[in-house]
Regions:
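Core dinuclear metal-dependent hydrolase active-site scaffold
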Residues: 1-25, 92-153
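Active-site metal-binding motif and surrounding structural segment of the metallo-beta-lactamase
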Residues: 7-11, 15-66, 159
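Active-site flanking residues adjacent to catalytic metal/cofactor-binding acidic residues
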Residues: 12, 40, 138-139, 163-165
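Short, well-ordered alpha-helix to beta-strand connector turns
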Residues: 34, 87-89, 158, 165
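A short helix-to-beta-strand connector/capping loop
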Residues: 61, 85-91, 105-107
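Cap/insert and terminal regions of metallo-dependent hydrolase folds
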Residues: 134, 142-175
C-alpha cells in the first residue's frame, strides 16, 4: 500500500521472503522503508518475515504492526516474536474487526473476519480506502460457503479485489 502524496508505504503480511517483498517495493517506489505491516493471521506464510526486523538483521525501531487481538497476544507471548515487542523493534497496533482506522489522512483500513483455520489467531481480510478508491484484500480462506459474506456482492462494491489464490483445489500438495 503506497501513498504517493506522502511517500508512506505499508505491506500486508510479512512473508518468510520479506527480503523479496522489500526489493519489489523498492523497485516500484525507490525505497524499502516501510511505515507499517498489516498482518492477516498466524500462519507461517503471513508473519514469519517479522523476524527480519530484529537485532540480528534489520534492527528496526518501532515499526507499527497492525494485528487483531489474538494475533497480537500470539506475538507478545511467543518467541522470537516477543523479543521484537520487548526490544521495541515493532510496535503492536491492535485492531478490531469491522472498525476503520486511518493509516494517514489519505488511507483507511478496516479489517474483517474471514473463515480459516484459526489455531493461533483470527484471520482477517482488509478493506482499504485510498482517497476515493476502495479495495479488498482477502488472504487464505477455507471455503467461500463458510463465510456469511457473499463474495460476489462484496466484489461489486469495490474498485479492486485481491484474493489469495495459492491453491485451486484440495490435494494440490502431496502430503
Amino acid at each position: 500500500i503506497v501513498d504517493p502524496t506522502t511517500n508512506e508505504q505499508w505491506i500486508i503480511d510479512a512473508t518468510p521472503n520479506i527480503k523479496k517483498q522489500l526489493q519489489l517495493l523498492k523497485s516500484k517506489t525507490g525505497t524499502e522503508k516501510i511505515d507499517g505491516v498489516l498482518l492477516t493471521h498466524a500462519h507461517m506464510g503471513h508473519y514469519t518475515g517479522l523476524m527480519h526486523f530484529g537485532r540480528e538483521v534489520m534492527g528496526t525501531n518501532g515499526i507499527p504492526v497492525f494485528a487483531m487481538p489474538k494475533m497480537a497476544i500470539f506475538l507478545e507471548e511467543n518467541g522470537p516474536w516477543s523479543q521484537l515487542v520487548e526490544l521495541e523493534n515493532i510496535s503492536l497496533q491492535k485492531l478490531k474487526s469491522d472498525s476503520t482506522i486511518n493509516l494517514n489522512e489519505n488511507i483507511k483500513i478496516k479489517p474483517f473476519l474471514v473463515p480459516h483455520r484459526d489455531e493461533f489467531s483470527e484471520t482477517v481480510g482488509y478493506e482499504i480506502t485510498i482517497n476515493r478508491k476502495t479495495l479488498i484484500f482477502i488472504p487464505d480462506i477455507d471455503k467461500w460457503e463458510k463465510w456469511e459474506t457473499n463474495i460476489t456482492e462484496l466484489i461489486k462494491k469495490v474498485d479492486y479485489a485481491f484474493l489469495d489464490a495459492t491453491f485451486y483445489k484440495n490435494g494440490e500438495l502431496k502430503r
